[in-house]
Amino acid sequence: MELDVFAGQEKSELSMIEVARAILETRGRDKEMYFNDLVNEIQNYLEKSDADIRSALPFFYSDLNTDGSFIPLGDNKWGLRSWYAIDEIDEEVITLEDIDENAPKRKNKKVNAFMDGDEDAIDYNDDDPEDENFTPSSAILEYDNDNEDDENAEVESYDSELNEIIPDDDLDDVELSEEDDDDDYEDETND
């Protein structure tokens, strides 16, 4: 592939962003490209090795996002911003999102390398309540099904233990005032 824009220039002096812009311009409007295809064409044009491209890839992707002349169109497709009017950009993005919403969602299966088919091992990833298929454990279900009589019995036993410490009759006779507490504190600090 030859790009007329760079006629007479050294390929080694060209940046990947310049080449990407030129490739998209020569393809024309409505010929957006997947990121991988764009990188492959840049690599072929610049005649760079896989190692060189791999090392430059993070910087190229950052430049592609920050350069105002490129626009992501979803599904890792890229185009030139000049191809789209502002209103058309919003519509284009919305239509791509609408298409994605209608597509069935595929749930990623979690893989735990430490499980190794051991049935006795505990999989802590299965108890996330935010998962769509979460079912509460039996302990939670048992708690919800507790009898109220059991709870009342616990409260009564707790009250009886408190009555052993301070009988109910004595509670009415005791009056606390803040002054009494302060005086005791002052006496202790002066000693």
Swiss-Prot record:
InterPro entries: Asxl_HARE-HTH (IPR007759), RNAP_delta_N_dom_sf (IPR038087), RpoE (IPR029757). GO terms for molecular function: DNA-directed RNA polymerase activity. One of its GO terms (cellular component) is DNA-directed RNA polymerase complex. Residues 119-133, 143-191 have a biased composition (Acidic residues). PROSITE patterns: HTH_HARE. Residues 119-191 are annotated as: Disordered. Participates in both the initiation and recycling phases of transcription. In the presence of the delta subunit, RNAP displays an increased specificity of transcription, a decreased affinity for nucleic acids, and an increased efficiency of RNA synthesis because of enhanced recycling. NCBIfam families: RNAP_delt_lowGC. This is Probable DNA-directed RNA polymerase subunit delta. It comes from Streptococcus thermophilus (strain ATCC BAA-491 / LMD-9).
